[in-house]
């Protein structure tokens, strides 16, 4: 996701989260979930993502390697339960926003500590997890009585809504910004290259034929857009495309889940979200379009290296500054820290709280130079 400075049309984490909540609310309502729980999960799911998105996440993981690493989902949990100063404990320390178990659990996309889920310390759970060891106590409280390693249905809805939200709207952005000319997708060679790029990027088990069939299904719908010149009519057509595709996905998943689990309210661990294979293939295809026409062309741009360097610079200057530059809301934690590891976690929390714009401003102020990132 590009920052707003790149183009005013492009979405931010906030607008993306609002769109995810809209999708999640529709699907949750169709399945009889508690709307507040689903809404909370969808609106909160990206709180822990640092400046520069996944590129910044990789940089902070390097910075935090000696203290257990950095992961955006675990940072989200830390914000909700430790960092946000809405509720204080007896010692006056922040303990988050005081959410219920159900709401916190619905945010847990990867419901395990680092290395304690699928694949163990050397597997997937070492890369994707929902809590640091520092926060294990409150994580254990949240998961009390929950099946080990299993996500509640509200978390599954949040995760799918996230996929739907960014896959559909990234395609919308690519077309509106001129990165993708829909007319090029009438060329069979171009489509073949798109399918291969999708499979290469996501490492999917789906064959090119499976993805090709998904493309044919979507491109065969009357609302599919075949050209775009920025006119009012085309802009309306593009907006209608996003609405129709989102509705298609929500209806397919709701129908399949209802066929399996019946018509009663489906909450917590009473059901698993059922995603038809064709729907999963169509979602992956749209994600592949975003990869092919937005992510791949930017993947090796010098800006990515500059972003990581900026984060490394900030970590160094904050760590060696004796608390100088740390926000007042985190300064008490810094002064209470008993060792450098604890202070480094404060520095990571601080950098993760910044936006792209504020990270550049902090770098210019603290590192004594103007950032061109």
Where are the predicted features?
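Alpha-helical phosphate/pyrophosphate-handling elements in metalloenzyme active cores
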Residues: 6-37
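Short alpha-helical catalytic segment bearing the HExxH-like zincin motif
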Residues: 38-43, 159
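Sequence-structural signature of the catalytic-core scaffold of metal-dependent phosphohydrolases
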Residues: 22-25, 30, 47-237
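C-terminal subdomains that position terminal phosphate/3'-OH groups for nucleotidyl transfer/ligation
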Residues: 199-338, 342, 354
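Glycine- and acidic
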Residues: 3-9, 41, 147, 227-232, ...
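Catalytic phosphate-handling regions of large nucleic-acid enzymes and associated NTPases
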Residues: 4-16, 47-52, 63
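Hydrophobic (often cysteine-bearing) scaffold residues that line and stabilize catalytic clefts
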Residues: 16, 52, 56, 72, ...
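Short, amphipathic C-terminal "tail helix"
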Residues: 339-372
